[in-house]
C-alpha cells in the first residue's frame, strides 16, 4: 500500500491521514494470516524531539505511540518499521516501546533528537533493495539486516567523501528493549531477528520447487525463526525447560531439512 497527500496519483492507495491509514490497515488485517509479515516504510518528514516527535501527515500528526496503536490488531503478524524521516529517533523510540514483543523490528535513521535534518539513509536503503545490491551472502534474498548495513555503510562513506561530519547515525532494535544498536549483529542483543526477516520479493530460489518442497522450505524457515526467538529469551526460562524446548525445535528442524533434501532426489 502507498499513502500520499492526495488521490491524484494513481499509485496512491489512500490519503496519508489518520483515517485513511487506519481504514486501510483494518482492511489489510482482514486479508493477512497468522505468521505473515508486514513491513512499514516511513518516508517523509518528522518534527519535534524525544518521544513527542511526530510523523507529519495530512491533518493531525502522530507520535510514535499513537502510530503504534494503529497496529494493535496485528497480534499474530510480524511487524517491521523502517523510519527514514527527519527527527526519527524520538518517534521510533516511542513506537518501539509501544509495540515491543516477539517479531517486532524497528529501524531509525537517526540515533538522537539532535539529528533532525533529512537523512540520506532512505536513499541507500532503497538502493540496497534495488537489484538485491545489499545481498551480501548471495542467497538471492535481502534481509532487513543486510539492507540496514548496506544503507548505514553507504551513509558513512557519503559523509567521509564529502568531508563532512556525519549528521545521522541509524540504529536497529529487534529484541524489544527500545534501545537501538548502531552495529547490530546476530547474538549481540539486536540483529538476530533482522537477519532472518526478508523484505524483498519472493525467494528466487523457490522457482521450480514442487508444492511439497516449497511447504517444507517454509516450515524450515519457521523453525529457524523459532530457534532464534527461543535463544533470545533464554533468560526467561528454567534451564531444563529451555534445553527441552530447544532440543524439540532442533530435532524437528533436522527432520524437516532431511525430508526437504530427500524430496529433491525423488
Regions found by a protein language model. Give the residues of each.
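Cysteine endopeptidase catalytic domains of the caspase/legumain-like
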Residues: 1-266
